[in-house]
């Protein structure tokens, strides 16, 4: 052996030197100081830009109160900010297409969460723990032949 280890201290130093560091997430912003992310839910796809501001949310060039009339959907969109304790600190501009209103609200929430982590990487653990960064992969089950719907059978008559 060319090199021998004399004590346990040297062994622990070698271990820490060889251990790879956890991946460091960097701030990802464009020249306008905006973070961009895409969010998906069911059939809906949202393109989201966030920038520091007064908390104004615009969806498809309309106010969030106009586009998402139901309070539950607006609450869904605000969840990432409230969990990260950043309510009213960022302006959100997003375009969303496909699916229904519930899927679109979920897609916007997913996009906002991802954009927040690009803007402030230290929020990643909080949002990940809340489940905002994972893509909800549940989609509508396909219709099968020989059935009325995905699982419902045609009416059965015994005689």
From Swiss-Prot:
Domain of life assignment: Bacteria
Alphabetized Pfam families for the sequence: Ribosomal_S9
PROSITE patterns xrefs: RIBOSOMAL_S9 (PS00360)
CC per GO annotation: cytosolic small ribosomal subunit
InterPro entries for this protein: Ribosomal_Su5_D2-typ_SF (IPR020568), Ribosomal_uS9 (IPR000754), Ribosomal_uS9_bac/plastid (IPR023035), Ribosomal_uS9_CS (IPR020574), Ribsml_uS5_D2-typ_fold_subgr (IPR014721)
One MF term in the entry's GO annotations: structural constituent of ribosome
GO BP term, example: translation
Keywords: Ribonucleoprotein, Ribosomal protein
UniProt-listed HAMAP family: Ribosomal_uS9_B (MF_00532_B)
Family, as annotated: Belongs to the universal ribosomal protein uS9 family.
Listed name of the protein: Small ribosomal subunit protein uS9
Gene behind this protein: rpsI
